[in-house]
């Protein structure tokens, strides 16, 4: 995948460049990202996680082929060239099947890898770090690496079978704590040590050699580490460059490798720029984008309440809360405290568990009604100023149409702009 190998080559030549990965399956988030990349003439990396998308459908109901079709169709409708799209698979391994014995979980992981690669995903994160039902806790580096090498061999074979050759690129390693934001309140975070990073690399190098995969080592472009960034429900641990000096220096010894940083959501623009400068050149972002989507929708719902009687309004906030209470499986084990604390977390937590509920039919119908209600007549400018002040400024300057969809897209793009600036070293206008 030339976009990514060229990015790494440029970074290794001393450029402070990188790339961000959009980790979301929400149509409005993806539309915002595609339009932003189109306006700024950059490639776009979109990633699906093993929880979202798998051979059985994941929680989105999409297989990898479905997800590719969905993204490509959206890109085509926005005149974004498919050649500029990069699809990635995140945390591919036995993650979804940790409750099964290792043999069964890895058999499922084999099929997971095949389905992603056959569908045209080119950036593959091999993550076999999680213990299965009959495994020791934690797994040794050697077991993790052996399982990753097994999956890499399947990926290479599948790519050659379907496309004639393999141009896959790989990311290895994992971060702590778990993907998608920490479950508990955080106060401090351990940065990955250089020795631990080297041990992960060497274990994987050895395991790849045993599988006859030494030739693909230059295509292992990323190592996932913990640079000291994380968020929980109400707090953010900001990047502290001085704590990552040794880790940052360590990767300079590897010609074709950069770090991949997960859970970079909600970092300041300055921290994002510093992360890229310090060789964390692949920045993952997901919850911050759906958090921005939720902010925009709550703002529009507040505007709707000001304009319309209750009987004709969408009641989006009420519908959302009702569905989340009826189906608590996506938030119950994450949000703690008394009733009020959990209510606030459902609506406003940085971990944004609400993102799992947007596809629900009742919520989607309320969203559609909200957009229809506010599209019928021009939204009064003072209300836009009250609830979406950054978008108000653009509307006043003539740079943004004050329609519900455009206001939502613009608000999401405010987050994307920070990542773009960190990776490109420039500040650009929204689409």
Swiss-Prot record:
- A Pfam family that this protein carries is GatZ_KbaZ-like
Pathway assigned to this chain's UniProt record: Carbohydrate metabolism; D-tagatose 6-phosphate degradation; D-glyceraldehyde 3-phosphate and glycerone phosphate from D-tagatose 6-phosphate: step 2/2
Tell me which GO cellular component terms the UniProt record holds: plasma membrane
Give the InterPro entries listed for this entry: Aldolase_TIM (IPR013785), GatZ/KbaZ-like (IPR012062), GatZ_KbaZ_carbometab (IPR050303), TagBP_ald_KbaZ (IPR023435)
Gene Ontology terms describing biological process: carbohydrate metabolic process; D-tagatose 6-phosphate catabolic process; phosphoenolpyruvate-dependent sugar phosphotransferase system
The entry sums up its family as follows: Belongs to the GatZ/KbaZ family. KbaZ subfamily.
Give the multimer and partner information: Forms a complex with KbaY.
Function (record text):
Component of the tagatose-1,6-bisphosphate aldolase KbaYZ that is required for full activity and stability of the Y subunit. Could have a chaperone-like function for the proper and stable folding of KbaY. When expressed alone, KbaZ does not show any aldolase activity.
Q: What is this protein called?
A: D-tagatose-1,6-bisphosphate aldolase subunit KbaZ
Q: Which organism is it from?
A: Citrobacter koseri (strain ATCC BAA-895 / CDC 4225-83 / SGSC4696)
């Amino acid at each position: 995948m030339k976009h990514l190998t060229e990015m790494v080559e440029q970074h290794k030549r001393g450029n402070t460049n990188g790339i961000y990965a959009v980790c979301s399956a929400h149509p409005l988030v993806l539309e915002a990202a595609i339009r932003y990349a189109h306006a700024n003439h950059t490639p776009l990396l979109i990633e699906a996680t093993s929880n979202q998308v798998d051979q059985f459908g994941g929680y989105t109901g999409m297989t990898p082929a479905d997800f590719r079709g969905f993204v490509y169709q959206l890109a085509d409708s926005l005149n974004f060239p498919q050649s500029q799209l990069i699809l990635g698979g995140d945390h591919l391994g036995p993650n979804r099947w940790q409750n099964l014995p290792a043999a069964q979980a890895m058999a499922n992981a084999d099929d997971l890898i095949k389905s992603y690669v056959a569908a045209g995903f080119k950036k593959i994160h091999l993550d076999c770090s999680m213990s299965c039902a009959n495994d020791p806790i934690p797994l040794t580096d050697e077991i993790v690496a052996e399982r990753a090498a097994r999956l890499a061999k399947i990926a290479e074979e599948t790519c050659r079978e379907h496309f004639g050759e393999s141009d896959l690129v790989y990311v290895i390693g994992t971060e702590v704590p778990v993907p998608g934001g920490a479950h508990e309140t955080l106060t401090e975070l351990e940065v990955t040590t250089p020795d631990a990073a080297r041990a992960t690399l060497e274990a994987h190098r050895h395991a790849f050699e045993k599988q006859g995969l030494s030739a693909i080592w230059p295509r292992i472009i990323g190592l996932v580490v913990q640079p000291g960034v994380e968020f929980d429900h109400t707090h953010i641990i900001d990047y502290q460059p001085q704590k990552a000096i040794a880790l940052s220096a360590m990767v300079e010894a590897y010609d074709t490798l950069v770090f991949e940083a997960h859970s970079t959501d909600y970092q300041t623009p300055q921290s994002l720029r510093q992360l890229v400068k310090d060789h964390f050149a692949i920045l993952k972002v997901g919850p911050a984008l759906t958090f921005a989507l939720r902010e925009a929708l709550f703002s529009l719902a507040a505007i709707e309440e000001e304009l319309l009687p209750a009987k004709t309004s969408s009641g989006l906030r009420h519908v959302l809360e009702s569905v989340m209470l009826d189906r608590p499986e996506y938030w119950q084990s994450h949000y703690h405290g008394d009733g009020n604390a959990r209510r606030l977390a459902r609506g406003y937590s940085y971990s944004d568990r609400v993102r799992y509920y947007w596809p629900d039919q009742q919520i989607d119908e309320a969203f559609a009604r909200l957009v229809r209600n506010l599209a019928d007549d021009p939204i009064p400018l003072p209300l836009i100023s009250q609830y979406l002040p950054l978008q108000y400024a653009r509307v006043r300057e003539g740079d943004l149409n004050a329609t519900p969809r455009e206001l939502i897209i613009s608000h999401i793009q405010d987050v994307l702009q920070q990542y773009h600036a960190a990776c490109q070293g420039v500040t650009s206008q929204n689409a």
